[in-house]
Design a protein with these regions (language model features):
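N-terminal "arm"/small-domain region of PLP-dependent enzymes with the aminotransferase-like
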Residues: 1-71
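Conserved core of the PLP fold type I
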Residues: 57-58, 63-139
Length: 139
């Protein structure tokens, strides 16, 4: 079967992620990478993460912590963000807040929302390679 006949035309513009190629370099033991947005694992607050994990999975709400949730994000976190925004004079509601799993997901959502067919996107130079990949996928 000729898969090109059934795939969306945007697939012709898609290519391997530059970030994925950069990450392959990290497998080399003599490389100290300053690219790719990879933080030093020694800086991770692992003990704080462990305590938060244990607290979250204790008690009667443990099952809810592992369950699927609304796509907008965890409502108590969105409510907390609303309160924090109000403290600095920015009015909003939880419906104005969208929690993403990271910058890449946010960029893909923005690209879906903002890029029209044959539209133009301006970026600075140098720019985040992940943004180019997210934007390039849309007409």
């Amino acid at each position: 079967m000729q898969w090109n006949q059934v795939l969306a035309t945007r697939n012709a513009r898609m290519k391997a992620s530059e970030i994925r190629e950069l990450l392959k370099l990290l497998d080399q033991p003599d490389i100290i990478s300053f690219a790719g947005g990879i933080p030093d694992p020694a800086l991770f607050p692992t003990e704080a993460f462990r305590e938060a994990f244990n607290q979250t999975l204790s008690g009667d709400k443990a099952g809810a912590a592992l369950q699927y949730s609304v796509s907008e994000g965890y409502r108590p976190l969105r409510d907390w963000i609303v309160a924090e925004m109000a403290k600095i004079g920015i009015p909003c509601t939880a419906d104005n807040i969208l929690i993403t799993s990271g910058s890449q997901q946010a960029l893909v959502y923005l690209a879906k929302l903002m890029i029209s067919p044959n539209g133009t996107v301006l970026v600075g130079w140098p720019t985040y390679l992940g943004a180019l990949g997210a934007f390039n996928a849309y007409e």
